[in-house]
Structures are given as structure tokens and as C-alpha cells.
Amino acid sequence: MLRLRNCGIEIINCADTKPGAVLYFFCAEKVDITPAADMAVAMIYPYEWNSMMTPWKSAGNNGTGDGDVFAEEMVKNIIPVIEEQLGFEQGIRGVGGYSLGGLEALYMSTRYRIFDFVGSVSGSMWYENALEYFENNRMNVKHAFISLGKREAKTNNPMRKSVLENTVKIVEKTKEYADTVFLMENGGHFTDIRGRIERCKLDFNSFCK
């Protein structure tokens, strides 16, 4: 694993040749992803998850709100390091993430025009002001993949109960300007994390063909 000052990086690439596409994916814990032909996956493991994966501060939640700083670091420093290592010069880029990582990925796609694909896997669309933000800020992508567990809204936490309603509204908004896949998965937030990420990867792979 490549370790930078603010995140660990694991690159999954099945070929010695230069990949034609790269998917950058944010995750809190290490997940073993299957290599896929003609593409690479760069698993990004931020050291300060709650801080780096939240684009703005949430009232009452200390240690949040550095996602914009991390996004800039990704674009200016982290992505160039990875692409130099891969020999990736031109092709398709995607950004995705799990949980708060999904929130950060969608946010990055609104701030920068370097991604063709965005993926949110069990994304934290319950986060304060997330719905309002994505209803008013367009994602600069051609294709979006958004998934959520069927039981994720079944919680006693009043804020997190909104995750399904908010996600559906964001999906409908995204469909207005990008090809969008919305997948309801079995289980709750922590069910089959690897499988859910794999399905996002497969959708990215299909988009690239």
C-alpha cells in the first residue's frame, strides 16, 4: 500500500499495460477488490474519515467539514501521483465512495470537471444540507451509479432516517442531466460492503466500454 500524508492508497490493476480507465474509490477500511481488464481501481483510505469525507461542517458534529480541502488535495497531488505510477495519460476517470465517501465523491463531481463517472455506494445522503446541495449543484459527469441498502432508513436516528428519501430525490435530479443507475441492495448499511463496491466497479467498467 502506498502511504501519503493524509491517506493510504491501494492500486488494483490486473495488467502490465497502461489502463484505459481509473476509478478512484473512498473507503474507511480495506476491501479486497477483484481486478478488471483494461481498468484500474485506486482504493483511497483517508486517515481522518469523518473530517475528510464531509464537504462542510455539520452542526453538533465536531471534526467534520474538511472534504473540500481533501478534494483539492486529491486533484492537485494524489491523482497525479497515482496516474504517474500507472502510466495513465488519457482515458476515463471515475470517482466513487462508500458511506461518507459516497457523499464526498458526489461533491467532488460538482466541484471539478475531470471525472466522467461518479458512484455513491450506501452514500450518506442524510448528511446535513446534502439534499439541498445536490438539488442545486450539478454533477459534471456523463454517468452516475447510486446504490443504497433497503434497510438503511430503518433507524431510530431522526437524521439518518432521511437517507432513502434524500437519495431518491438526488437520483431524480441527477437523471435530468446524466445517465443514472439506481440500485436498491439487500440489507442495511454494513451488509455486503465488498459486493456493493464490486457492483459499482462493474457499472464503471460497463460505462467504459
What are these model-predicted stretches?
Residues G94-G97, V121:
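Short beta-strand immediately N-terminal to the catalytic nucleophile in serine-hydrolase-like folds
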Residues G8-E10, T17-G87:
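Serine-hydrolase catalytic machinery in alpha/beta-hydrolase-like enzymes
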Residues M125-N205:
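The feature captures the conserved acid-bearing segment of alpha/beta-hydrolase catalytic domains
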Residues I114-W126:
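A conserved short beta-strand
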